[in-house]
Amino acid sequence: MGTVNGEYEDFDAANRRAEVIDWLGGLLPEFDLPLDSSDEELRDYLINGEALCYVADKLMPGVLEGTWGGYASDQRSNVKKFLSVVAEMGLPGFGVKDLEEGSMSSIVECLLALKDNVATQLGGHISNSTAKTPIRRKLELRETDGPVLSVATPGKRYPKSQQRSPLLSGQKINEVVQFKHGTYTDLPAAKISEMLHSNSLDNAPTQSLLRVVNGILDESIERKRGEIPHRVVHLLRNVIQEIEHRIGIQADHIRNQNSIIKTREDKYRSKIKALETLVNGTNEENEMAINRLEVVKVEKSKIDEKRKLGEQDMIRLIREKENAENIIASLHQEMQVMNRMHEQFREQMETKARQMEEHLTLRAKEAEFCLMQSKKKVEEVEATSQLKSQLWSKKANIFQSFMNNQKLSIKDIKISSQSIKQEMYALQMTWRDEISNIGHDLKGLVDAAENYHKVLAENQKLFNEVQELKGNIRVYCRVRPFLPGQDGKLTAIDYIGENGEILIANPSKQGKEGYRMFKFNKVFGTHSSQAEVFSDIQPLIRSVLDGFNVCIFAYGQTGSGKTYTMSGPGTSREDWGVNYRALNDLFDISLSRKNAFSYEVGVQMVEIYNEQVRDLLSNDIAQKRLGIWSTSQPNGLVVPDASLHPVKSTSDVLDLMEIGQSNRAVGSTALNERSSRSHSILTVHVRGLDVKNGSTSRGCLHLIDLAGSERVERSEATGDRLKEAQHINKSLSALGDVIFSLAQKNAHVPYRNSKLTQVLQSSLGGQAKTLMFVQINPDIESYSETISTLKFAERVSGVELGAARSNREGKDIKELLEQVASLKDTIARKDMEIEQLQLLKSKSPNSMTDRNGSNLLRQSTSSTGLSSLPVASQQNQQLSGSVEAEAEDNASDDGCSVGETEYSPAGASETSAERAHKAPSRITRFFLTKNGQPSTSRPKPREVVPKTQGSMRPGTAQATGGSLAKPSKRR
């Protein structure tokens, strides 16, 4: 009985759901669900609430717009709007959770109730409209103020003449409905005739037609006389006929639906009665059948399980059979092999048996002979044993007497041991008390040691901050481990402390005089890895992204591991040196800051070989020689003619570094098989742009691998190696002079004595963070070089450069720099024109030159438009005076521009193109002051420096008050 009732309930629910789907299909054109759709399919279509809101708006236009503001993006809001409309109508609703995950019966009941309510209202309007006049219907419409509901016939479609077209219904009838500025009597007859002859009334919505009727009736009531023009009456008659036609169609549809529903109800009642009769008569049979069915189901499930188990057993047996067959085949093959081996073994054993038989026969004869001899020996042994037994009996008597004496001694020892135990117990108690006192004292020592380490760490942090504020050159010392095969050598390193101490032992002296202690910022022992070394300098390198200039260089004798520390022995990640790790770290940080900052990274790699600067990343490295800027430039370039390669990732850096290392000058000496014969300089330029405020920052990282200092008698250098060693020692000596001058705070620092010190001028001269790696050899043979290197490092650690400054430029400074660049370009063009005029003047007569020159100058002035530049006229006059003064200074000098080295042969004349190339150097007096404002003041007199042994010209360019003085010529 329960099963039948359940089936009937499912059947009834399916019919009601199909009825709802049929009704929604008539209302919504895009509703395409089949009538036999499940609850889940209907739920998926209605769950967002838009279809429910569309149904409510379709049945009652404007009910959502005035109250709720249209559809919402949230599905719960749409469903709540629909439920509010249903509640206002007094119809049963449903819960939001029922629509999301509950039963669909409540949703179906709600929609059917809404359908019945709409059909009831529509039937009442039809009966009233057929019995009353148009004026009465119009007045009732005003009283009820309810919308006329139009429900499409489900399962049917209007004919082509009645299908709604948005274009047709939106053009003709809307012009009449929205005619507000005039009256309907003012409508022209041609427009009304066009509407009547076309299908505009057929395609127009019922609401629009009712508005037309209401408008005409309102107009007639307002006139009070009731006079309506004939054309308007004709229009009104057609509109009313169309409305009555539509209402009739709706009434026919409702009657058809009612008859269909009654027929279905009669069928369902008869089926219900028959089912009730059948159910009442066959309850017991149903129960028995159900029980049997359950038993059959259980047996069927068991049979299915057995069948599945049998199939699994069959599959398993088949697999086992296949495995057994494979095993049998392999065993058969093995058996054949074993048979063959057995035959061979049997033959070998037979041969061995014959040999053993012959051997045993010989052994038997030998055994018989030995037996005869053994019998003789037994007789001799028996005689000797009797003698020995007599001796042992005598010894036993002696031992017995000895044992008696020992027992007496043991008694005495036991008595003494008791006394000793008592004494030991007393000592243990004394020791226990002393140990407890020692533990208490030791705990105090441990606490004091912990506090000592904390205070030591704080002091180290404060010391680093003081060093940062003072701008001291950080000095890190690294001890090279012994090379393979040198483990047996003596070392000069006696002790390495945790706080930067290193103790050097002198093998030729004894006692305290044989030891020398040095202290630096950090000392790395022989077992320190590349990662440990880089972790200590990582914060220093990261400050490059904040706009600081950083310089890291390695100093030490040949073979002390400078190139190992800076570049590493190979390209594997574990062997990376400071160069690779620094650039990789910069890329990682720039990637993490990409939302706030945009960074551009460029790489230069040059070497100083025999006092010549060469580009290691250029193809013509052997021919091209580069000059050095003697002053710090706004773009941070020290060697501007060297190729600057932009890099985007670590792989780009690896490729460039591999090219640079292959082009670097190396050679073999007695101290190092692959000795660096030049100073390698890797310069990383980082330009940052703040995405928010547009400010820029510029940082420069110099990674310098100095060539090793060496003694000629130890390196056994000759020929080119000797010349290279002389240049290397000379440049390192010049570096020592610079360090000594900085340590003494002299007014003049001899940067110009070497190309190396010129490159390091921007780093050693302040406004930069500088770090020096001191590389030393541990062997005792290099003691003198080690002491010399550590003394130099100790002197460097005392140099104070002042606090480093960040190179940041605001948006205003950036605009001023752009204006300066445009002025430089304009003045460069003017210089070229002036030089052309001078050439014309030297070639042509004076009269022709003056006339033509004035015309040419007038034309060039008008063409360039110098007066339109955004600079005051007073600044232009000062700038022109500065340019003229600069031209006079250059005329008195040898024509070498800023940062350029003169390589042209003596007596060679410069072409106009070369002078044009050097022309921008004449405007270097147009500079930015400290507050970011442009200035064109004259430079102060140059500092005159006496000539040194390096044949350097005096007049080093000095930056005074923000202006750039004229550089001098260098060779």
From Swiss-Prot:
Q: Taking every annotated instance into account, which residue ranges of this chain make up the domain Calponin-homology (CH)?
A: 14-119
Which UniProt key words apply to this protein? Answer: ATP-binding, Coiled coil, Microtubule, Motor protein, Nucleotide-binding
> Which residue ranges does the record assign to the Kinesin motor domain?
472-799
GO cellular component terms given for this protein: microtubule; microtubule cytoskeleton
Q: Which residues form a coiled coil?
A: 272-357, 809-844
Q: Where is the composition biased (Polar residues)?
A: 839-881
Please list the GO biological process terms of this entry: microtubule-based movement; microtubule-based process
The annotated region (Disordered) lies at 839-971
A molecular-function term among this protein's GO annotations: microtubule motor activity
Instruction: Give me the residues that bind ATP, please.
Output: 556-563
Family named by the database record? Belongs to the TRAFAC class myosin-kinesin ATPase superfamily. Kinesin family. KIN-14 subfamily.
Instruction: Output the PANTHER family linked to this UniProt entry.
Output: KINESIN-LIKE PROTEIN KIN-14C, KINESIN-LIKE PROTEIN KLP-3
The protein depicted here goes by the name Kinesin-like protein KIN-14C
Q: Which organism is it from?
A: Oryza sativa subsp. japonica
